[in-house]
Regions:
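Short, small-residue-biased leader/transition segments that mark boundaries at the very start
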Residues: 1-9
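Conserved PRPP/pyrophosphate-binding segment of the phosphoribosyltransferase/PRPP-pathway fold
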Residues: 8-117, 124-160
Length: 160
């Protein structure tokens, strides 16, 4: 399969997150030992985007993983402080520029923490990289990421 690598399961966010996490556990697509992490942190949306959408899909996934694993979920440790344009049509360099200074981590909450960062999709890794850098800058000891899907290769559609 080329393009997006997924778990081959349709995701209808609010209604199916619990089922998806149970399915991941059943399929052994799961981190068996979450005890190496102190907190689960979802990639944040800007408050305006969250109001517009009505939910943060990464937060819903993180909350369900926390519920199933008994781990602490800390959605307030990382905030999106700058509204950014959508990333969907941007390449790696443009995504990186688009996300400069977009995130702030709470240094008191992050200090000394080993963090599992959760997102729904990883395309170029720019969002996860900026979040990781900000959490480490704020004093986190380590940051690892868990995503449900990633784009293996981004193909350009159209000519030019």
């Amino acid at each position: 399969m080329t393009g997006v690598q997924t778990c081959a399961l349709p995701i209808y966010l609010r209604r199916h997150i619990r089922f998806l996490c149970a399915w991941l556990r059943w399929r052994k697509i799961w981190i068996d030992d979450l005890t190496r992490f102190d907190a689960i942190v979802p990639v944040p949306l800007h408050p305006a985007r969250k109001r517009e959408r009505g939910y943060n899909q990464s937060e819903l996934i993180a909350l369900e993983i926390g519920h199933m694993s008994g781990m602490v979920v800390m959605p307030k440790i990382l905030r999106r402080v700058r509204f950014t344009s959508t990333q969907t049509k941007l390449g790696h360099d443009d995504r990186a520029r688009n996300l400069e200074n977009a995130f702030r981590a709470d240094a008191v909450m992050a200090k000394g923490k080993r963090i599992l960062l959760v997102d729904d999709v990883c395309t170029t890794g720019s969002t996860l990289g900026h979040c990781r850098d900000e959490l480490l800058r704020a004093g986190a000891v380590s940051v690892e990421a868990l995503v449900l899907a990633w784009v293996e290769k981004r193909e350009v559609v159209g000519g030019g």
